[in-house]
């Protein structure tokens, strides 16, 4: 553990853990601390974080609070959704995709204020420590990283509270008892993990769900919306042009009201263990269905199938923290190229936990109704051509079968 750090930029939420980290950095490293708090759409007031940082001795000029919602959706969420990225077949990567942006902002601030270190509040068991630190090193190779949870001896809630009381860190009454589960949230999703959720055999209590109503409690009448796309990105809802963050927020409202986006899963962490989480991604679930809907009529079959083959690798890179890696950028270039004609409108029916595409249209549609119709007509497709096509594709199968017979 290096003690020659002069100034450190801390990813700061204003909560108990990062407030303890702030004071621990001051007392252990005896360095100047700069705080960065991001508004990612987590639904919390951020000014209390400023006041708490000031109370803990941070100079006003060393407190950075930034609304990054538009940048988050435009430059991180939307590029990821162009790929239809899903980790292990279920997880829409809501937590994973937020970490690179936070890391980027910390490095930008470090350069601005002349800091020689950055710090985060991720534990030594989870994925976030990897995501943050890979981002730091990719953007600033020589930066010093301080990960308090891997260094200190504050290994229990009791010790954290004792440290806070010793150093006069304000503790909200509801924080003195250990929370039944931990929550991480941003504009794309919220995740709940730990405590009451640790046994994967037990059903998650209803109070865990904070962003969606139960599908059973959703309206008995469907909500039908139309989402407009331009080059793979959603740009409008029901004909109203919206900014990326505003559009996602609107989809979140629609998804919440219809019980859409709940997910209870056990995933494989990058660090090697399995973890159980309850995720809510109402707007993202609708967006994914709609994007696949518009791609279904605008992407060539070969391009669509190749995208689906590449997607798991792309999703894994994001999950594991390699957003700034050459391979992710290479895949992104291919994915973005595929979206040149992914423009049009998709109609989606929202009903009791389901987002179902019921219509799609595009000026660049590859769907040819004349080719697929069962009615007679003068079209380029001749049924007789299928015979040769089938025979050629069956050639290797017939050859293999003949060999098997011969070997009997």
UniProtKB/Swiss-Prot annotation:
Binding locations of L-citrulline: 91, 96, 127, 131, 182, 191, 267, 279
CDD domains recorded: ASS
Reactions catalysed according to its record: L-citrulline + L-aspartate + ATP = 2-(N(omega)-L-arginino)succinate + AMP + diphosphate + H(+)
Subcellular location: Cytoplasm
Binding annotation for ATP: 11-19, 38, 121
Example GO BP: urea cycle
GO cellular component term of the entry, any: cytoplasm
Pathway: Amino-acid biosynthesis; L-arginine biosynthesis; L-arginine from L-ornithine and carbamoyl phosphate: step 2/3
SUPFAM superfamilies according to UniProt: Adenine nucleotide alpha hydrolases-like (SSF52402), Argininosuccinate synthetase, C-terminal domain (SSF69864)
Residues that, per the record, bind L-aspartate: 123, 127-128
Family classification: Belongs to the argininosuccinate synthase family. Type 1 subfamily.
UniProt-listed PANTHER family: ARGININOSUCCINATE SYNTHASE (PTHR11587:SF2)
Protein name per UniProt: Argininosuccinate synthase
Lineage: Bacteria, Pseudomonadati, Pseudomonadota, Alphaproteobacteria, Hyphomicrobiales
